[in-house]
Amino acid sequence: MRITHLAASNWRNFKNVEFDVGERLFIVGPNAAGKSNLLDIFRFLADIAGQGGGLASAVDRRGGLKKVRSLFARTNAKGRLVVDVTLRDGDDSWRYRLSVKGEGKGPNRPVVDEELVVKNGEELLRRPDDRDLMDEVLLTQTHLEQIASNQSFRSIADYFDRVQYFHLVPQIIRDPSRAVVADDDPFGSDFITQMNATAPRTRDAWLGRMQQALRAAVPGFESLT
């Protein structure tokens, strides 16, 4: 399974963004153009679907709905934060759409405004449904994050849960104070640990392929070692 198309509204510094996703995608732009914000859409879906995650947690990690939602939101898409992805899994085509709004009262929690799942043109889920209308607290969670509710589209949840993000920062990799860190730190504090844990034969093969690619792309480059 892989994502083939992405559309989003009111995400970070983007009013609207939409593009196809090939097997390999390069995102190029000047500093502060929003490259990391764009990639964070995929991390956002992973944080919702992942173990111990969920919609509330994914939004809180980013500083709350005010931080995540674009300043354009007041005049765009009714103020909703919208993520709409198309996926391909063999012969099957999937679509997952999530629209989020503020609760509008109390702590203004993020709630589901719309959640849609379509497989091969057949609608598997559309929220809010009758249960949501009877108990609005249910809208504080997506069905994507609930094992009891995502049976018919669990392959999507599992796919999002496997999303990985790496943004290696040399200063963090070399920082001795970060010798003991949580696993899978995206900024590389456990990068050396991961390298050492990789089988030498596998590690050498990977480094060899990287070295060949760098020789072809970087004038004067000779070796990684």
Where are these regions (language model features)?
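N-terminal pre-Walker A segment at the start of P-loop NTPase domains
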Residues: M1-K15
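Electropositive, glycine-dotted interaction segments
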Residues: R88-L224
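Short, conserved catalytic or interaction motifs in soluble domains
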Residues: N16, G50, P219
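Hydrophobic anchor at the beta1->P-loop junction of P-loop NTPases
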Residues: I27
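Conserved lysine of the Walker
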Residues: K35
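Conserved P-loop NTP-binding catalytic core
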Residues: D40-N108
